Curated annotation (Swiss-Prot):
Membrane association type: Single-pass type IV membrane protein
Keywords: Acetylation, Coiled coil, Endoplasmic reticulum, Golgi apparatus, Membrane, Protein transport, Transmembrane, Transmembrane helix, Transport
Name assigned to this protein: Golgi SNAP receptor complex member 2
MF term (GO), any: SNAP receptor activity
Organism field: Rattus norvegicus
Superkingdom per UniProt: Eukaryota
Gene behind this protein: Gosr2
Length: 212
């Protein structure tokens, strides 16, 4: 298990460094970088499935720690996947905005009585304002989606960690009072997470209302 874990852990760090290349890549190479990162992420998910099987076969005294290490890798790669999707969403929105601006600049309007071209400054200004609003909303939605994905992944990790802690507690023979305190803390964490999600949605709604 250890060689595969070290290989996967190294791949996660390599992807983190490659994410910085996305911001500096030109239009011709950005798709190649995205595909390269996505292929590495897919390979890591495949390794994680194998690691989960191997961790369950570890000796009892090392099994819990092995599963926690695998869960941490899964949490890290889920964040990388979310970051990649958000970048792709922003890039596609920017490319669409540029195409629409180019189409508008290449279009001319004429009057019915003559071939006099109508000035387009006001139309361009109005279109630019709309595109800025749309771009701001896209960034906001992408950021909110990233936060919600992070909270969801954290909830899954905490849930798995709680179960493992309870299993360890049972093996060690901890008292019922300690067990109840652990369960109470997990219950409180759940409400904190739900409150954070609701607050995020409320902020997104208010900002969208302000922008429109």
């Amino acid at each position: 298990m250890e060689p595969l874990y070290q290989q996967t852990h190294k791949q996660v760090h390599e992807i983190q460094s490659h994410m910085g290349r996305l911001e500096t890549a030109d239009k011709q190479s950005v798709h190649l970088v995205e595909n390269e990162i996505q292929a590495s992420i897919d390979q890591i998910f495949s390794h994680l499935e194998r690691l989960e099987i191997l961790s369950s076969k570890e000796p009892p005294n090392r099994r819990q720690n092995a599963k926690l290490r695998v869960d941490q890798l899964k949490y890290d790669v889920q964040h990388l996947q979310t970051a990649l999707r958000n970048f792709q969403h922003r890039r596609q929105a920017k490319e669409q905005q540029e195409r629409q601006r180019d189409e508008l600049l290449s279009r001319t309007f004429t009057t019915n009585d003559s071939d006099t071209t109508i000035p387009m400054d006001e139309s361009l200004q109005f279109n630019s304002s709309l595109q800025n609003i749309h771009h701001g909303m896209d960034d906001l939605i992408g950021g909110g989606h990233s936060i919600l994905e992070g909270l969801r992944a954290q909830r899954l990790t905490l849930k798995g960690t709680q179960k493992k802690i309870l299993d360890i507690a049972n093996m060690l023979g901890l008292s019922n009072t300690v067990m109840r305190l652990i369960e109470k803390r997990a219950f409180q964490d759940k409400y904190f997470m739900i409150g954070g999600m609701l607050l995020t949605c409320a902020v997104m709604f208010l900002v969208v209302q302000y922008l429109t």
